């Protein structure tokens, strides 16, 4: 007995055994393969095997593999947040600290230079973010000698349509976003940082999930934030700010972004890495 060779053509009227219509393939010699698999002997289709006894299945569960960790904390000191907000808004008027506020090249926002951690008036912010960064490094079994910030900058959004393209932070281990001021515009996307799945191939097939739809099976996640919310994450995790069409009601969106590195050793059995 040999496997038949023949051309297949699409037959939209094909039937499956329970009588429900379903697309299938029909060969030129007249029979339909409902299973979608070319598997027949001597031009005869192979019928699905009948299961005569019910197979009992227990302990069904859904696990999450390869998570991207997001470290979250919050500052509730209103005086501190108000002071940082005032200092950043003051810096927007200084052309030596970043882009000029209201610049026609970017009328929706302002960005400081990435040396904010070197300015005396931001040392308390630097020290706070450095302490939080050290806590994240301590979560891992690194041989840390010192944690330090390589860069730190402020982002200010004034008006609707402000956004920030999806991006990563190369040449860094951990990055963070400190939400100093959050506009009350009634939508999470305008307030927070949106994170994207770093695995493009995972979105090649993306069925609708009607049950249990949450961060673990979504392509993007926009966590709810408040004034003082701090996120830290691996620098390779794509993130950005989605465009908002609503008025900020006079409250600018102010965040401080930063990158954290270490001196010491990330040790594995086969490939230790030394940072100096």
Regions found by a protein language model. Give the residues of each.
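Arg/Lys-rich, low-complexity, intrinsically disordered basic segments
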Residues: 2-35
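Hydrophobic residues positioned within well-ordered beta-strands of beta-sheet architectures
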Residues: 71, 150-152, 174-176, 254-258
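Short, solvent-exposed loop/turn segments at secondary-structure junctions
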Residues: 78, 183, 200, 237-239, ...
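Active-site region of the double-stranded beta-helix
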Residues: 120-150, 158-173, 180-188, 273
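Short edge beta-strand segments in beta-sheet-rich domains
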Residues: 149, 188-190, 251-255
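Catalytic core of non-heme Fe(II) oxygenases with the double-stranded beta-helix
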Residues: 154-232, 266-269
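Catalytic core of Fe(II)/2-oxoglutarate
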Residues: 212-276
């Amino acid at each position: 007995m040999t496997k038949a060779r023949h051309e297949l053509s699409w037959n939209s009227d094909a039937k499956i055994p329970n009588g429900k219509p379903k697309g299938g393939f029909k060969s030129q010699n007249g029979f339909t393969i409902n299973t979608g698999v070319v598997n027949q002997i001597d031009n005869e289709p192979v019928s699905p095997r009948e299961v005569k006894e019910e197979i009992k299945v227990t302990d069904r569960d859904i696990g999450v593999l390869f998570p991207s960790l997001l470290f979250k904390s919050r500052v509730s000191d209103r005086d501190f947040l108000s002071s940082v907000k005032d200092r950043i808004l003051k810096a927007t008027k200084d052309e030596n600290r970043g882009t000029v506020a209201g610049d026609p090249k970017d009328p929706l926002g302002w960005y400081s230079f990435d040396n904010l951690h070197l300015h005396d008036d931001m040392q308390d912010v630097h020290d706070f973010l450095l302490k939080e960064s050290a806590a994240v490094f301590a979560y891992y079994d690194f041989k840390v000698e010192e944690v330090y910030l390589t860069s730190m900058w402020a982002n200010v959004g004034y008006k609707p349509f402000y956004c920030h393209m999806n991006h990563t932070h190369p040449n860094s281990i951990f990055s963070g976003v400190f939400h100093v001021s959050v506009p009350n515009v009634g939508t999470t996307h305008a307030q927070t940082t949106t994170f994207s799945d770093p695995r493009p191939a995972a979105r090649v097939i993306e069925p609708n999930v009607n049950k249990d739809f949450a961060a673990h099976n979504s392509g993007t996640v926009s966590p709810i934030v408040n004034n003082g919310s701090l996120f830290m994450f691996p620098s390779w995790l794509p993130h950005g700010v989605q465009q908002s069409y609503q008025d900020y009601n006079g409250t600018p969106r102010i965040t401080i972004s930063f990158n954290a590195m270490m001196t010491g050793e990330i040790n594995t059995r086969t490939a230790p890495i030394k940072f100096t």
